[in-house]
A protein has these predicted regions:
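N-terminal secretory signal peptides that target proteins for export/translocation
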Residues: 1-6
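Bacterial N-terminal signal peptides
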Residues: 11-20
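Phosphate/dinucleotide-binding and metal-coordinating scaffold of catalytic cores
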Residues: 25-389
Length: 389
C-alpha cells in the first residue's frame, strides 16, 4: 500500500494527510460521549440481513426465569454482527453490534443495543470504554429515568454510570432517542473507587439465597475471592438474628445505606432493594467489602412497584433485597436508613431544580423522538407529579 501511495498525485497525498489529521483531532473522550446539554448523533450502518437477524433475537420468558438460574447466570440469546458506527461525525469501523435487554425492554423495531468498539480492532475505544450501551427506554416513556437517576446517584456520592441522550439511526432510519449508559467496567470503577482490580458482579433477578451463589454474573476479577464473599453473605442472610455489625463486615454500610436510600427516594421499584434486580456488586480490594451500584434504572419515579402491587407497603423504603431486609429488621438499620434518606432530602432533592431539569430535557429531546415515543410529554407529567409529592 505504501508503494501505491507514492504513485498518487501530490494533491491526493495532501488531502489524505488532512483527513487523517482531522480524524485524529476529532478523537472522542468520555466527556464527548456523555454530554448533558445536547443529544448525541449515533449513526449505525449494518447489512440489512444482519440487522433483521439481531433485532428478532429474543429471550424466552420461561427459560429466563427458570430455576436453573440459581446455579448459573442466565445465558443471553444475542449474537454480535459486524457494523460501522459514527458518533457525532467520528467513524468507528467494523464494530460489534448486538441486541440487549432482559424481558421488558425487548423490541424488534427499536431494540436496545450493545456496540463493541474493539470487536475487530482490539485497540479501538473511547477513553478506556470499549463497549457502548444504548437503551431504548421502552419501559420508560418519560425517557428521563436513567439520565436523572444516575445523575442523582453520582451527585450524592454513590458510584453509578454516566448517562447521555442519543438519537440513534440504523441504515438511515431514525429509531428515536436512546439513553447512552456508561458500561460498568473500568471507567466507572476507577471513578467511583479509585481502582478496578476487584471482583465485579452483575445481579439480574438474583439475591443472596442459599444455593444461589453461582447465579451472580462475574464481569471482572478473581472468581474464588468473589464466590467466597457471596457465600459468607448468604450464610449471614440465612440467620434470622443477624446484626448490622455482622453485615458491615462484608458490605460497606456507609455506601450501602446511601445506595439503598437513593433507590427508595427515586421510587426505583425494579432495583436491588425493590426487586432484587438491576444492580452491580463490587468487591473493593481497599475495603474488602461489597459496594453496590445501580443498573437498568429505567423504572424510576413511581410510588409503588409494578410487580406485587401492595398498598400496605411503605413508600419511603424498599426491602425486597435480602441485605436491605435484614438491615431493616434491626433498630440500628432503621435509624441509619432514615438518616441517609433525610440527608438526601436536605442536600440533593431540590424540587424546583428537578422540575426545571424535566422542562430542559423535554425541550432537548423532543425534536429527535420516534413515533413510538409519542407518549413522552404525557408520561413526563407523572414524573413531575412524583417530584412535587
Amino acid at each position: 500500500m505504501f508503494f501505491n501511495i507514492l504513485n498518487k498525485p501530490a494533491t491526493w497525498l495532501c488531502a489524505s494527510f488532512l483527513v487523517s489529521a482531522t480524524a485524529s483531532a476529532k478523537e472522542l473522550t468520555l466527556d464527548d460521549v456523555f454530554p448533558t446539554d445536547r443529544v448525541l448523533d449515533v449513526q449505525i450502518t449494518v447489512a440489512e440481513k444482519d440487522w433483521d437477524k439481531i433485532r428478532h433475537q429474543a429471550r424466552n420468558f420461561v427459560s429466563a426465569l427458570h430455576e436453573d438460574r440459581k446455579t448459573a447466570p442466565i445465558d443471553g440469546p444475542y449474537e454480535y454482527v459486524t457494523a460501522d458506527v459514527t458518533i457525532d461525525g467520528v467513524k468507528f469501523e467494523k464494530v460489534g453490534l448486538r441486541k440487549k435487554g432482559f424481558i421488558g425492554s425487548q423490541s424488534t423495531s427499536r431494540p436496545s443495543l450493545k456496540i463493541k468498539l474493539n470487536h475487530t480492532d482490539k485497540a479501538q475505544k473511547i477513553g478506556g470504554l470499549t463497549n457502548l450501551t444504548m437503551n431504548n427506554n421502552k419501559q420508560d416513556n418519560t425517557i428521563v429515568s436513567q439520565f436523572m437517576g444516575y445523575a442523582l446517584f453520582n451527585a450524592a456520592g454513590s458510584p453509578a454510570p454516566r448517562c447521555a441522550f442519543a438519537k440513534v439511526t440504523v441504515n438511515g432510519k431514525n429509531l428515536g432517542v436512546y439513553s447512552h449508559v456508561e458500561t460498568v467496567r473500568k471507567t466507572v470503577l476507577n471513578r467511583g473507587f479509585g481502582n478496578d482490580d476487584g471482583t465485579l458482579y452483575e445481579g439480574t433477578v438474583v439475591d443472596f439465597y442459599e444455593g444461589w451463589d453461582g447465579s451472580f454474573e462475574r464481569k471482572t476479577g478473581n472468581r474464588d475471592a468473589g464466590l467466597a464473599h457471596i457465600r459468607k453473605i448468604i450464610e449471614l442472610c440465612e440467620n434470622e438474628s443477624v446484626t448490622e455489625e455482622a453485615i458491615g463486615k462484608l458490605v460497606d454500610l456507609d455506601s450501602f445505606y446511601q445506595f439503598w436510600a437513593i433507590e427508595g427516594l427515586l421510587g426505583f421499584w425494579d432495583g436491588y432493594s425493590g426487586n432484587a434486580n438491576n444492580f452491580f456488586a463490587y468487591l473493593n480490594p481497599k475495603t474488602k467489602k461489597f459496594h453496590f451500584m445501580p443498573w437498568g434504572a429505567d423504572s424510576l419515579f413511581r410510588k409503588r412497584s409494578m410487580l406485587n402491587f401492595d398498598f400496605r407497603a411503605p413508600l419511603s423504603v424498599k426491602t425486597k433485597g435480602r441485605i436491605a431486609y435484614q438491615l431493616y429488621q434491626t433498630e440500628a438499620g432503621k435509624k441509619r436508613y432514615r438518616e441517609a434518606l433525610h440527608g438526601l432530602l436536605k442536600y440533593h432533592w431540590n424540587e424546583e431544580k428537578l422540575l426545571s431539569e424535566c422542562d430542559r430535557i423535554e425541550a432537548l429531546v423532543e425534536p429527535h423522538l420516534n413515533r413510538e415515543q409519542s407518549r413522552f410529554s404525557r408520561s413526563l407529567r407523572g414524573t413531575r407529579e412524583f417530584i412535587r409529592e
